[in-house]
Amino acid sequence: MQPIWAVGLMTGTVLDGNIDVALLKTDGETIAEFGAYALKPYPRWIRDLLEQAQAEARVWNFEGAEPAIFAEAEEALTRAQSAAVRELVEESGLSMADIGVVGFHGQTVLHRAPQAGRLGDTRQLGDGRLMSQLLATKVAYDFRTADIRAGGQGAPLAAVYHAALLRSADASGNTAILNLGGVGNITWWDGDDALVAFDTGPANAPINDFMKKRGLGEMDRDGALAAKGKVDEDRLAELLKHPYLIAPYPKSLDRFDFTEMMADGLNEENGAATLTAFTTSAVGKALDILPRRPKRLAVSGGGRRNPTMMHMLVERAEVELVPVEALGWRGDAVEAECFAFLAVRVLRGLPISFPSTTGVPEPMTGGELVG
């Protein structure tokens, strides 16, 4: 198949108020061209609606009827993200007729990993049929459910796109890709058949929630608060005994599996420092269980903008860092690009998850396609 223009959409679990939207020209196996990307802000009322949906999802916990707010939030975010797609396409001098498919991840409100004798569950808000009608184009969506039903983790799904990025940058196995969003996830590829991906632990979510809880703003901007604090090493040592951190992959996390309560009783500076140290130390433990420990990490996601977190990564995970921009990638666009890439794979019937990335029995396709 010849490469086609696809649009990818992603909104992270930290609910930073932005819709990540990116254009990518691809055949679902290689990257022909990076197109434009943008961070399009949600109206405040939609962000508030999504925060309420996320809170009600935790109470619901996959038991009984879904909260009524889901339908309201689903329609609102679908319309907002459809508008973001159209804006980006038109700003790029293209029309929707030029777009082969849109990859619509939706908003994760709850994710539950499988356990022995029990399949996992996942819920992303997003109405792919409505988006297809609004944009008059094909839409791939609901990327995780098939994987979960087959016994997989349903996450992370970025591995096959990360491998395509590494193919042109470093296919030696010496470089892994670390994404620091609400949760951290890592992809390692040996350049051949070994492709491994899993969630490393929390990333920005507990720190952001800690800041909000203390009335200090939305996030620890530039890691300024953590930089003033002292890590509670005794508490950190206890936190690092969590069984998830040494469990074998594949494995995945919900955004609330590790919370800001890990810093209860600490002052503002020391709490921020200890949570940041936990995120980075968890990455170090993740590197230790890979088939081969990479020498460097290409870091994407919002966490890469936190100098304190980056310094602690070098120090506590004992690894070299390289900005994804130095490899010719766009750190803010990688996740949205990923869902453009996966959408083309859905269109072609190619696998999007694998035994070594989500734990499914065999490489499998996924996602719903409409339009």
Swiss-Prot record:
Pathway: Amino-sugar metabolism; 1,6-anhydro-N-acetylmuramate degradation; Cell wall biogenesis; peptidoglycan recycling
GO MF term set: ATP binding; kinase activity; phosphotransferase activity, alcohol group as acceptor
Superkingdom, taxonomy of origin: Bacteria
Keyword terms of this UniProt record: ATP-binding, Carbohydrate metabolism, Kinase, Nucleotide-binding, Transferase
EC number: 2.7.1.170
Keyword match Kinase: yes
Reaction(s) the record says it catalyses: 1,6-anhydro-N-acetyl-beta-muramate + ATP + H2O = N-acetyl-D-muramate 6-phosphate + ADP + H(+)
InterPro entries, per the entry: Anhydro_N_Ac-Mur_kinase (IPR005338), ATPase_NBD (IPR043129)
Record: residues binding ATP: G12, T13, V14, L15, D16, G17, N18, I19, D20
Enzyme class: transferase
GO biological processes: 1,6-anhydro-N-acetyl-beta-muramic acid catabolic process; amino sugar metabolic process; peptidoglycan turnover
Protein role: Catalyzes the specific phosphorylation of 1,6-anhydro-N-acetylmuramic acid (anhMurNAc) with the simultaneous cleavage of the 1,6-anhydro ring, generating MurNAc-6-P. Is required for the utilization of anhMurNAc either imported from the medium or derived from its own cell wall murein, and thus plays a role in cell wall recycling.
Protein family per UniProt: Belongs to the anhydro-N-acetylmuramic acid kinase family.
Name of the featured protein: Anhydro-N-acetylmuramic acid kinase
Biological source species: Brucella anthropi (strain ATCC 49188 / DSM 6882 / CCUG 24695 / JCM 21032 / LMG 3331 / NBRC 15819 / NCTC 12168 / Alc 37) (Ochrobactrum anthropi)
Gene assigned in the entry: anmK
